[in-house]
Amino acid sequence: NKVTILFNEYIKIEDATNKVVVSPPQLEVPEIKAVGKKIVVELNDTLKPDVTYTIDFSDAISDNNEGNPLGNYTYSFSTGERIDTFEVSGTVLNAEDLEPIKGILVGLYDDLSDSVFKTKPLQRVSRTDSRGHFVIKGVAPGTYRAYALQDASGDYYFNQMSEAIAFSHQTFEPSCKPDIRQDTIWRDTLHIDSIIRTPYIHYYPDDLILMAFTHEQTNRYLIKTERQEPNQFRMYFSYGNPEIPRIKGLNFDSDNAFLIEHSAKRDTITYWLRDTTLINQDTLRMELQYLISDSAGVLVNQIDTIDALPKVFYEKRMKERQKEIDKWMKEQEKLRKRNKSYDSIVPVKPLEPHWVNASTIDPDKNVLVSFSTPLERLDTSMIHLYVKVDSLWYRAPFEFGPKDSIPRTYELRAEWREGQEYSLEVDSAAFCDIYGLASAASKQGIKVKTNDEYSSLFVKVSGINDNKLIVQLLNSSGGVVKQVRPHGGTAEFYYVTPGKYYLSAIFDANGNGVWDTGDYDADRLPEGIYYYPHVIECKAKWDVTERWNVTEIPRTQQKPAALVKQKADKEKKLQNRNAERAKKLGIPIPDEYRW
C-alpha cells in the first residue's frame, strides 16, 4: 500500500490534505510526505481488487528552491490487469449566484439509484480548482451520475443537511477520441515563439455543470440569546416558526412585560421591556418554552432556563449618565456666570425619527422613517405634506403606515410628480414610543428628480419561459437595484440612475418571487439563475434596449468577470515559469507545460 515517486531534484509538497485527492476515496486518511527527492504515499485502506487508483497531486508538488509547481500531476496504478483511463470533467457553480466553487469534492456513481448518495462513498473523486473546474481520472467504462459534496464529515457521502451538495438528473457514458489543439510556445514571459498543433486524446463528457446548494435549514434550535441593550433582549433560532416562545419570569413579573417583534422569517425574536424597573434590572432569569426539532426532525416542546444580562450593567450606565449630567451642569454654570441664557433642568432627549430618501427622491420610491424603539402611538393628523405649484403651496394627499416586514419602519406614500418640490412638516409629539419619549417638530423639503435625470432600460428576453422569470438590474457590486417580471417578453426598468449595470434572472418555478434552494430528498433542483454576460451603460435621457437569450451560452460563461468574486489562480504565469526553467536546464518542454 505504499507508493514512492522519484524526482531528479529536491521537491516539497504543500497542503497535501486539501490538494491531493486519492481515488477511489480513502476513508483512512493516507500519509503523504516529501522526503528529499521523492514523495511517499502510504494508503491505509485495504486496496480493492481490479480497480484503477489515481493519486491527483494538483499543484501541490513544487521544487524546493524556486517553488515552481509541477502542476496537474496524477499518478495511476491498478490492482488488476488493466488501467482505466477515461476522464470526466466539468464545473461546479454556486446555484444562487453562479460563483465558481473552489475545493468542493466531485464524484461519480455507476449505481444510478437516488439513495446511493446518502448511503455509500463516492466511487471516483476529484476536487475543483479556483475556477470551479474538476477532472475525474481513471474512470472505467459504464453509465454514471455526477455529484458534488462539501464533505464536512469526511466520509464521502451526503449525511449532513448543512453540507453543500450538487446533483444532476443527467446520466452519461465516458468516451474519448483523437483530437488536435493549438499550443503556444513562449520565447519568454512576453513573447510568443510559435503556435503548434498538438494531437491529444479528448475525453468526454468535458462540459458537466453541477449547481451546488445548501438545503434550507429546517432543524429548529435556539442559537443564542443576547441582551445588547438594557431595554431589550433577542433570541436567534436556526429556523422560524409561527408559534412565539412562551416566557415565564423567575425573578420578575412577565405578565404584559414585553412588546414582541419578529423578523420576516420569525427566526429572530426581539422582546422589548416595557417597565423601567426591568430595564434597570441586570439579570432577568426566565423559563423559556419553545419548539425544537428532535433527532427525527419532529417539533417538540423544550423548556430552558435563561439569564438575560445586558452588555453594560446598570451601575456603570448610571456612572456614565452622571458624567454627562455633570458636564452639562458645568456648561450651564459657565453660561450663568457670563449672564447668558441657561437651563436649570436637564433636558430630555426627544424621540428621533430617522428619515430616508427625505431630501431628494426618485418618482417611483417613497419616503421611509425608522425609529430606534417601538412606537406606542402615532398621529397621522400631525403629519402634513405640501406640494409647490408655481409659487404656492398646496396640501398633497398621502398615506402613512408600517413598512412590510421591517420592524419600526414606516412609509410615507404619495403621488410623487417628477420635478416637483414638496414640504414635509411634522408637529411635535406626532410620534411617541413605548417609554413616553415624543418626537420634536420638524420640517424638511423634498425634491423629486426630473425624468431627464434618468435612463430607461428595456430587456427583450428569450430562450426560456418568461412567465416564470424575474429579471434583476444589478449595480457594479452585484447588488440588486431593481427587479421586474417581463410582460410580453420585455422587462422594463424605468427611472434608472445613469451608470453601468449588469443583469441577472431567476427562473421562479414556484412563483413566490424569490430564489429557492434545492431539496435532494424531494429530487428538486435549485431554481435557475442566469446572468447577462455584458455590461450595460445607461445614460441620462436615453432609452436603452438589450436583447437577451437567457440560455444561449452555458452558465459557466455567463457571469461577467467583474462580478466574479472567486478569481481564478494565475495558472498561465505558473506554467510559464516551468517553461522558462526547463529551457534553462536544457531539457525539452513537456506537453503539459505548453500554453
Which sequence ranges carry the predicted segments?
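N-terminal targeting or signal-anchor segments and their processing/structural boundaries
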Residues: 1-595
